[in-house]
């Protein structure tokens, strides 16, 4: 879909970036000459704007063979960043998509600056294009299928074509992996059970030659996965422990463990959610989707790293067999847990997932979960909450999140917080000390299972879905953290 060329071959649709106070040169000067100075006149008359994110549409003379030119304002070049490049491309391709254009050429060099080289601009182009044109799959009798879809995007450049094509390929992998995560999260709970999620993971493994292991209920019972099994007790659907292994090094060492919460629907159990809180709980497997989206990106790019993805999956339902408040369960680690809140189930399955990842060689751990409403109260819907037991590893995750445009904010875990989750007369831990510092309590609980392994917890309860459309796509699932995990995998430096 995305390809690089050093030739501008009379495209019907053209995209051009404009910096403030910039002059026409290269392909833009060549194009202006073909248009008899029409672009120069448009700029002079103010009919196109270089203001950041402003899209201007121009209808060139029929003799040129072009039907439409889209100008996107880039603002001041001195203030222009990689993240700005992605947003500008998203905005212009959102307009291109609305206009049902199928073949587009982009004058890539007009998006290049000292801070954004051609390969990075190419990455931003393909990633943002795929995110911007994504549409939610519906299940209507007469589905609103687009009659025309974007088929090809040509990045026209005078820079090194191999580097530009490589950038396009990387960006396309990131965009597609994120969109795959979005699609999983948007699926209804009756169409995406733990079994369905496991089948999806197995197909991903077959496509990218990952090792794949799907642990069944009897195997979990034999191993003693009391956290995942307890949450599953109320369900008629069997649980699955999904394990994907990517080995990019000769030796299985310096392994990045990615653990994603895979609760395919969450009623809250006997601590049942209110009617306004239960709708939308199909998205409670957002962490699992992020991990699978990241694994798709990893499969495409094949970094020289080792990755272990672990996804404990079930739904959290109510029945005569379901887990109850006051129950005491035994986790895979051997630690016992008093259940004070059956709606604090995500941390129970993550406890077993983290322990399993450690047992199978994870050197560092990142868990991703739609875990608490408390993180939304604290940080809103645009910032992911983060907690850690290791400052240096956290910095690597934070840098990856920044590069991906998926901001995170660290919340503290103090010794007093740890004491609160250890406060139980009946067990080693309790799963819900109270509402105060709720997001932190959840992180502190999970940290009891990470123990001394470098670990970062990402609570995406506020960022996994968006209530309204943005330039990066429609309302619904965002696929958040798929890109961050993939960047972390590419950039990870083990501590020696």
UniProtKB/Swiss-Prot annotation:
GO biological process: proteolysis
Cofactor note text: Binds 2 manganese ions per subunit.
Pfam families found in the cross-reference section: Peptidase_M17, Peptidase_M17_N
EC code: 3.4.11.1, 3.4.11.10
InterPro entries assigned to the protein according to its UniProt record, in alphabetical order: Leucine_aapep/pepB, Macro_dom-like, Peptidase_M17_C, Peptidase_M17_leu_NH2_pept, Peptidase_M17_N
Cofactors demanded by this protein: Mn(2+)
Molecular functions (GO terms): manganese ion binding; metalloaminopeptidase activity
Catalytic activities: Release of an N-terminal amino acid, Xaa-|-Yaa-, in which Xaa is preferably Leu, but may be other amino acids including Pro although not Arg or Lys, and Yaa may be Pro. Amino acid amides and methyl esters are also readily hydrolyzed, but rates on arylamides are exceedingly low; Release of an N-terminal amino acid, preferentially leucine, but not glutamic or aspartic acids
Entry keywords, A to Z: Aminopeptidase, Cytoplasm, Hydrolase, Manganese, Metal-binding, Protease
PROSITE patterns: CYTOSOL_AP
Binding, Mn(2+) 2: 261, 266, 284, 345
Subcellular location per the Swiss-Prot or TrEMBL entry: Cytoplasm
Gene Ontology CC terms, in alphabetical order: cytoplasm
Binding positions for Mn(2+) 1 per the UniProt entry: 266, 343, 345
Disulfide pairings: none
Active site as annotated: 273, 347
Family: Belongs to the peptidase M17 family.
Function statement: Presumably involved in the processing and regular turnover of intracellular proteins. Catalyzes the removal of unsubstituted N-terminal amino acids from various peptides.
Protein name stated in the entry: Probable cytosol aminopeptidase
Taxonomy of the source species: Bacteria, Bacillati, Bacillota, Bacilli, Bacillales
């Amino acid at each position: 879909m995305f390809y690089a060329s050093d030739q501008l071959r009379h495209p019907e649709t053209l995209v051009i970036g404009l910096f403030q106070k910039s002059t026409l040169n290269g392909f833009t000067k060549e194009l202006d000459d073909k248009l008899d100075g029409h672009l120069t006149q448009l700029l002079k008359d103010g009919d196109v704007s270089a203001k950041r994110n402003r899209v201007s549409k121009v209808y060139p003379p029929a003799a040129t063979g072009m039907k439409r030119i889209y100008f996107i304002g880039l603002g001041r070049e001195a203030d222009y960043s990689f993240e700005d490049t992605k947003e500008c491309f998203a905005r212009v391709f959102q307009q291109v998509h609305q206009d049902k254009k199928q073949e587009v050429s982009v004058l890539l060099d007009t998006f290049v600056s000292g801070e954004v080289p051609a390969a990075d601009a190419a990455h931003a182009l393909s990633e943002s294009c795929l995110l911007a044109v994504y549409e939610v799959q519906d299940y209507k009798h007469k589905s609103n299928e687009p009659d025309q879809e974007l088929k090809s995007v040509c990045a026209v450049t005078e820079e090194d074509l191999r580097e530009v094509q490589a950038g396009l390929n990387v960006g396309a992998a990131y965009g597609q992996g994120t969109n795959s995560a979005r699609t999983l999260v948007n699926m209804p709970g009756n169409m995406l059970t733990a079994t369905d999620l496991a089948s999806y993971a197995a197909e991903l493994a077959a496509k990218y030659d990952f090792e794949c292991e799907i642990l069944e209920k009897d195997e979990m019972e034999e191993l003693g996965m009391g956290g995942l099994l307890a949450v599953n007790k109320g369900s008629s659907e069997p649980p699955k422990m999904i394990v994907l292994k990517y080995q990019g090094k000769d030796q299985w060492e310096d392994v990045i463990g990615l653990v994603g919460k895979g609760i395919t629907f969450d009623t809250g159990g006997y601590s049942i959610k209110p009617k306004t809180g239960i709708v939308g709980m199909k998205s409670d497997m957002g962490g699992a989707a992020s991990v699978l989206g990241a694994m798709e990106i990893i499969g495409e790019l094949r970094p020289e790293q080792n990755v272990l993805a672990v996804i404990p999956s079930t739904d959290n339902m109510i029945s005569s067999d379901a887990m109850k408040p006051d129950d005491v369960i035994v986790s895979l680690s051997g630690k016992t847990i008093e259940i004070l809140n059956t709606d604090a189930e995500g941390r129970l399955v993550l406890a077993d997932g983290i322990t399993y990842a450690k047992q199978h060689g994870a050197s560092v751990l990142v868990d991703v979960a739609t875990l608490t409403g408390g993180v939304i109260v604290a940080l809103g819907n645009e910032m992911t909450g983060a907690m850690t037991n290791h400052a240096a590893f956290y910095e690597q995750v934070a840098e990856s999140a920044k590069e991906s445009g998926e901001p995170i904010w660290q919340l503290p875990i103090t010794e007093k917080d740890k004491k609160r989750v250890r406060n139980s007369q009946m067990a080693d831990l309790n799963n819900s000390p109270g509402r105060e510092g709720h997001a932190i309590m959840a992180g502190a609980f999970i940290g009891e299972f990470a123990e001394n392994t470098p670990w970062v917890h990402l609570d995406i309860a506020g960022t996994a879905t968006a209530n309204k459309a943005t330039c990066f796509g429609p309302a619904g699932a965002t696929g958040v953290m798929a890109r961050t995990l993939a960047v972390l995998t590419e950039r990870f430096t083990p501590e020696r």
